[in-house]
UniProtKB/Swiss-Prot annotation:
Comp. bias (Basic and acidic residues): 15-29
Annotated source species: Mus musculus
Region: Disordered, residue numbers: 1-96
Gene giving rise to this polypeptide: Tmem40
Annotated Low complexity bias: 1-14, 46-68
Chain segments annotated as transmembrane: 152-172, 179-199
Biased composition (Basic residues): 30-39, 78-87
Name used for this protein in its record: Transmembrane protein 40
Amino acid sequence: MEASGSSSQSQDSGGVHRETEDHYQETELHKHHGKARERYKRDKSSSSSSSSSSSSSSSSSSSSSSSDSSDEDQPSRGPRKHRRRPRRDSLRGADHGELEVLKDELQLCGGAAGEMVPTGESGLRRRGSGSAEGEVEASQLRRLNIKKDDEFFHFVLLCFAIGALLVCYHYYADWFMSLGVGLLTFASLETIGIYFGLVYRIHSVLQGFIPLLQKFRLPGFRRTN
């Protein structure tokens, strides 16, 4: 009886010990699971905070770069506007000047029918004559440089006529015939000279001889009135 009682007590004590060990293991497992969950939550929160901080830093950097670019663009745009303004002012001034010139020309053209009217290219022409005829005549006069009242031209032609008169009198000894030849020579040279522009040619030839005459002129010689 005593042996059976001791064996039953030992079995009861062993069962209790096993139950305590199982309970202890379960509690440790629960602790490990709780710690693992806490670590996972901490890691997740830290990763979310780092991502939010990185996004905020990127947004701040982008905003700063955009503000810098806007600050740089503003001074660069300013001078361009200031540069464009003088061009517009110059164009307006040119248009205003052209309008004033046109007004002056209209005022000059508003005279009587027989007045001299200035034109842009053809020089002076008489109002009432055709514009095409005036331009042609002015261009011909400018090209030939003809002056019908040129005293030097008439003097040269008169010299030719006198020379022809003297030669004719030397050969024929008749003053009437000599005067006729001289007058014909003078008239023919006048018409030919006016028509073909001999005035300009004679002037050009004499102007070519003027430098030679100046070279041969004595340095101490002066003209006296």
